[in-house]
């Protein structure tokens, strides 16, 4: 990865803006991006891994026609007329578990507003109806972290969705769609697809696709690319009205990351690099359309709030698609207890023993977590400095074991145990435990479809089209020996920034 400074040059680009990094992001962001300056495509990512479970519960509680991100409909109302006038395309994964229903709702809104825009939707990601069939074909959905087959999880499967790629989006745009409603697609697909449409890229234009993959990866999480959640936050001039990111992508896959003028935040080599490291496990970033080699990138500061990224090499995509599976992992309950003064550990032990003796022992629970957080100080200057927290959490597939009775047993000890008892929150009723189960499925079983104007088109995964594999071979880099001499201690965070990324219950850290 090369860092530097670049003079701004004018080139033919497609300007792809982001207006959402998660379900619950700033509602006015779509209108802000459409009205704030010239863009060609408005995109939004709403689907964190566990969001699929939220949408599943929505379908269960409100009907089978639900299961999509309803707030996106408000955003469509806000921007549809302007997008029509400015010829701005909209591509989003807000379709969630029900892209067809969302497309129908959007068409109703457009009809009410007398706005003529073509709406396409994509499906084929839902693997739930096919799990048994795929098991019989040898697809075991082994957990990518634990290598355990799904059938051995001991949990009920709630949702199972393959991460689709970008070619369905390109197909929809090629056929004249103005709004493309996607289900579970890769976060970067909503950027790769429009770029491939703009420049007419072929399936094997791996370097260009890898560049768009990097661009999509950088802007998919909204303001994390423009100064939000940034380790060196003191560099950010203002956090008032932080601008959402825009990727200006060129025909060769090079791109510039920027934001609308007059907005807060910051676009710098640091903010872009931090987001590049987000949620990746290695420099070779796998995607169903291409493998992007992020260690080949060159990153240059073009001007204030403009960062140019180029040189990303690409390889043939893997023969598998990743699947996002969510399981019902039982129920949990717990409470935080505050301990003050002397003998903190003895107080925690006395309470823990009394509690589990009163409920019949720890063994009846599937999991028990007991943590004593020693935030107290030896010679405190205030009551707050004298406090420690005892956190007790229990989990069981049986909701009765971790229900209100467990909470009541904690409260029953309030006058019969350590001195100064009071709770810091939690308890009452049990909450569901959702287990994220990342897995792979052979791409030959992926059946993706684009629906527009009453016609349906099947999209074949690139890895199943018979192309010759093309893998980038990286030259080995010599690592200079560590410098020697006098040293001084300094906090790691003064020299290195970090960006954490989570996939359900799993997390990694890029430094």
What do the predicted segments below correspond to?
Residues 279, 283-305, 466-496:
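Short, Gly/Pro- and small/polar-rich lid/capping loops
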Residues 93-98, 177-194, 498-510:
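Conserved phosphate/anionic-ligand binding catalytic regions in large, soluble enzymes, centered on
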Residues 209-308:
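A conserved active-site cap/scaffold subdomain adjacent to cofactor or substrate pockets
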Residues 4-5, 9-32:
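N-terminal amphipathic/basic leader segments beginning at the initiator methionine
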Residues 38, 311-490, 503:
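C-terminal non-catalytic interaction/assembly regions of soluble proteins
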Residues 116-119, 225-238, 283-301, 358-373, ...:
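Flexible, glycine/charged-enriched surface loops at secondary-structure junctions
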Residues 10-13, 49-65, 84, 126-155:
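Gly-rich Lys/Arg/Thr-decorated short loops/hinges at beta-loop-alpha junctions or inter-strand turns
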């Amino acid at each position: 990865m090369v860092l530097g400074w670049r003079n701004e040059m004018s080139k033919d680009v497609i300007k792809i803006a982001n207006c959402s990094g998660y379900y619950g992001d700033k509602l006015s962001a779509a209108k802000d991006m459409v009205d704030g300056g010239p863009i060609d495509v408005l995109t939004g990512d709403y689907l964190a891994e566990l969001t699929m479970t939220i949408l599943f519960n929505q379908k269960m509680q409100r009907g089978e026609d639900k299961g999509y991100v309803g707030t996106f409909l408000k955003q469509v109302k806000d921007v549809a007329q302007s997008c029509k006038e400015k010829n701005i395309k909209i591509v989003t994964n807000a379709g969630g578990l029900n892209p067809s229903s969302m497309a129908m709702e959007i068409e109703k809104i457009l009809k009410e507003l007398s706005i003529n825009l073509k709406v396409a939707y994509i499906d084929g990601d839902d693997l739930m109806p096919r799990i048994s069939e795929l098991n019989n074909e040898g697809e075991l959905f082994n957990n990518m972290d634990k290598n355990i087959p799904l059938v051995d999880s001991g949990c009920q499967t709630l949702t199972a969705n393959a991460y689709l790629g970008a070619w369905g989006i390109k197909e929809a745009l090629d056929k004249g769609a103005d709004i493309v409603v996607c289900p579970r697609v890769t976060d970067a697909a909503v950027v790769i697809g429009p770029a491939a449409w703009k420049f007419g890229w072929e399936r094997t234009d791996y370097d260009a696709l890898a560049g768009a993959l990097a661009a999509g990866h950088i802007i998919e999480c909204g303001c994390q690319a423009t100064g939000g959640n940034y380790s060196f936050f003191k560099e950010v001039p203002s956090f008032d009205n932080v601008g959402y990111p825009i990727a200006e992508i060129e025909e060769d896959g090079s791109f510039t990351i920027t934001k609308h003028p007059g907005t807060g935040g910051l676009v710098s080599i640091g903010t872009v690099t931090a987001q590049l490291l987000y949620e990746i496990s290695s420099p070779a970033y796998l995607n169903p359309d291409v493998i992007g080699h992020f260690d080949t990138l060159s990153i240059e500061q073009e001007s204030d709030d403009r960062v140019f990224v180029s040189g990303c090499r690409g390889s043939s995509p893997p023969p598998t698609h990743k699947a996002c599976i969510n399981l019902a992992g039982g129920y949990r309950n717990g409470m935080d207890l505050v301990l003050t003064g002397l003998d903190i550990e003895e107080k925690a032990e006395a309470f823990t023993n009394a509690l589990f003796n009163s409920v019949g022992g720890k063994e009846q629970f599937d999991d028990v977590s007991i943590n004593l957080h020693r935030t107290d100080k030896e010679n405190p200057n205030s009551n707050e400095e004298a406090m420690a927290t005892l956190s007790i959490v229990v989990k069981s597939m049986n909701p009765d074991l971790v229900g209100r009775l467990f909470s009541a047993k904690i409260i029953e000890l309030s006058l019969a145990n350590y001195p100064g008892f009071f709770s810091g929150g939690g308890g009452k009723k049990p909450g569901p435990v959702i287990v994220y189960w990342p897995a792979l499925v052979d791409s030959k079983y992926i059946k993706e479809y684009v629906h527009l104007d009453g016609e349906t088109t099947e999209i074949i995964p690139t890895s199943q089209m018979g192309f010759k594999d093309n893998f980038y071979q990286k030259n080995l880099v010599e690592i200079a020996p560590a410098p020697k001499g006098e040293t001084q201690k300094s906090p790691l965070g003064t020299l290195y920034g970090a960006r954490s990324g989570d996939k359900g219950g799993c997390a990694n850290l890029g430094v």
